[in-house]
């Protein structure tokens, strides 16, 4: 009879590479050897071969994803507790996910898929209007949530500290920028947003008019808990004029930016050689005339993308103009590799693919216990209400 200890390490690694992300925790209890190998995977010592691990959104539900050059290998819906939650947005940082619920009040859930732990978080304010979120961490690896409110003339943001279970509020005085897209990416614990700068110019009547620049970058530094200065992109483009642009992280260490101009069928991708909250340098990664390999994509609408630096490939997710049908294109330099039909999906605010190259985390995020004094007070109130009825 063959024992688990008799299996070769290569075979065990192959088995572990096929284990759903959300089941890795159970694997560790199988035997000491498997426990050690799964720990290596957590610490990025042994990475899955030739595939990306991540999560994707299907009809407001979060599911795990494996993607390689042959396409999507499997779509496993996550734990029952998360499957019951309709999610509108998902953000990722260092093994944890932030899920924004689809309900009107937009509650927050922070989730560790590996440990199977979740924490529901009450938001601090009832401010209405456009807002966006991000999940990051400071230099001490403490996870934090950013909630940003922007309108034409002001910016207000709140920060939730996962470790202390507390919110803080901040104002940006007279911002000359605003964030009105959910286009952002996480690098080294900080979030980089696409934004626009406002500039005052004099017209022919010597009156001042406000104009906006094409897209630029701005970083939110989770250690300093503030926005940095403007960062340049390797090219100019303007989403308001029909250009398509997107951001993606590369193993949480580099930033990639994609461009497709409204009047061209060329996809251009650049990646950073250095990036910090106040400095960035770029190099070209990939430039493909998609008309020569796919034909004219008149209905191309960028949803999200990620890259494989070693193979010099990009996986670009697109939706049609109705945002109901999703397609993944695996493309390389001057050649088309594969097209994967993802089927019909409901329109989402969050990209269909949340991120790739997921790495499990051992960070504990169990629901914060309610202090006994507060719990007893709540019970007394509940009993009182019962008597009144």
From Swiss-Prot:
It comes from the Eukaryota. SMART domains: FBOX. Residues 2-49 form the F-box domain. SUPFAM superfamilies: F-box domain. InterPro entries: F-box-assoc_dom_typ1, F-box-assoc_interact_dom, F-box-like_dom_sf, F-box_dom, SCF_F-box_component. NCBIfam families: F_box_assoc_1. This is F-box protein At3g19880.
